[in-house]
């Protein structure tokens, strides 16, 4: 464990396994962070605590392909800021000088908002999407790491934020416990999760077409998946667009079409933007290695089991589960 004298002033990384403080060193011209026993490479100014190739590779490709698509600064919209505000459920001005951990940052759609409001931000992602985020936010402290083996001190962050990630981890409940470990007592945990209901876990006609397409897509070699998904998307998107004003036809289409189509749920600017956002999220939903669903009750029960307080969870406008909890001072 880290000695008490380091607890408040140390701002760097620790070994994910031993919690020893890591020091930067140069070996044969290459930079590393190292402890007594372990060392981790720094590549393109980003510390890497995982193998560069892992189950999140498709996400890494996705966020490099769509590096700016969902950035408010690029779209001219406030979609990401509004979602962040809704999940955190606090004034974003309260983020100023707060030590915030963003778990699963992708290309940085929320990173730029957190930085804008003055958060002392640390971000990480399992995939090499961290490189896209670093390009979008050059001053960001960021690393490539696993949510189950994070290189951070325990009881350190004021706020831990995890949006769009837990459902893609091997064990969402264990991931929540790990997030709580690095959160200060009385700190704020803000998370979301895919919602468990019949439509999300059964095949058509009760469920959606994603149930049928995804297992087939995952059988395809990773390097070919995007091309296949784009062909599927390009077939279905014109049909969705033609009937974009009919909610009834859109409901029918979801039983046979696997694509995401946001005309009735997001106020995007034009057809190209609907196309780009739809293709991005269609790729996301068809290539995720893990896909879990939980009810509000399941999430709340697990947080109660971990002695969290002020637990506030609900079904969000996009039909997911999201909310906040306060870490117990006595955990």
Across the structure, where does each feature detected by a protein language model lie?
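Catalytic cores of eukaryotic secretory-pathway lumenal/extracellular enzymes that build
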Residues: 130, 170-176, 194-195, 199-204
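SAM-dependent methyltransferase
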Residues: 218-289
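C-terminal lobe and adjacent flexible extensions of AdoMet/dcAdoMet transferase-like proteins
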Residues: 266-331
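Conserved class I S-adenosyl-L-methionine
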Residues: 188-227, 231-234
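A short SAM/SAH-binding and catalytic strip from SAM-dependent methyltransferases
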Residues: 159-171
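Conserved N-terminal segment of class I S-adenosyl-L-methionine
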Residues: 2-151, 291-293, 298, 314-331
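A short glycine-rich, Lys/Arg-flanked "PGG" loop and its adjoining helix->strand segment in the class I
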Residues: 173-185
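A short acidic, Gly/Pro-enriched loop at the edge of an enzyme's catalytic core
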Residues: 149-159
């Amino acid at each position: 464990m880290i000695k008490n004298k380091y607890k408040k002033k140390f701002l760097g990384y620790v070994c994910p396994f031993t919690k020893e403080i890591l020091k930067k060193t140069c070996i044969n011209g290459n930079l590393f962070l190292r402890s007594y026993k372990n060392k981790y490479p720094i590549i393109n100014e980003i510390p890497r605590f995982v193998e560069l190739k892992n189950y999140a590779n498709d996400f890494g490709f996705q966020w490099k392909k769509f590096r700016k698509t969902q950035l408010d600064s690029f779209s001219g919209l406030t979609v990401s800021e509004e979602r962040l505000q809704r999940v955190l459920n606090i004034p974003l001005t309260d983020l100023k000088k707060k030590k915030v951990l963003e778990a699963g940052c992708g290309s940085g759609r929320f990173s730029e908002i957190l930085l804008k409001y003055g958060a002392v931000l640390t971000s990480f992602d399992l995939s090499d999407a961290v490189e896209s985020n670093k390009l979008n936010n050059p001053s960001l402290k960021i690393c490539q790491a696993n949510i189950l083996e994070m290189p951070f001190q325990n009881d350190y962050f004021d706020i831990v934020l995890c949006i769009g990630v837990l459902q893609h981890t091997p064990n969402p409940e264990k991931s929540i416990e790990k997030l709580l470990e690095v959160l200060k007592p009385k700190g704020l945990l803000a998370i979301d999760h895919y919602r468990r209901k019949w439509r999300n876990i059964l095949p058509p006609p009760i469920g959606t077409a994603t149930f049928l397409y995804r297992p087939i897509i995952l059988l395809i070699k990773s390097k070919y998946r995007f091309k296949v998904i784009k062909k599927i998307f390009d077939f279905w998107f014109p049909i969705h667009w033609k009937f974009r004003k009919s909610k009834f036809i859109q409901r029918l289409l979801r039983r046979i079409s696997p694509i995401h189509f946001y005309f009735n749920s997001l106020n995007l600017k034009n057809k190209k933007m609907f196309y780009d956002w739809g293709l991005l999220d269609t790729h996301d939903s068809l290539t995720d290695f893990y896909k879990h669903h939980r009810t509000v009750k399941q999430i709340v029960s697990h947080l109660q089991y971990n002695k969290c307080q002020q637990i506030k969870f609900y079904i969000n406008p996009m039909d997911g589960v999201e909310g906040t909890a306060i870490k117990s001072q006595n955990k």
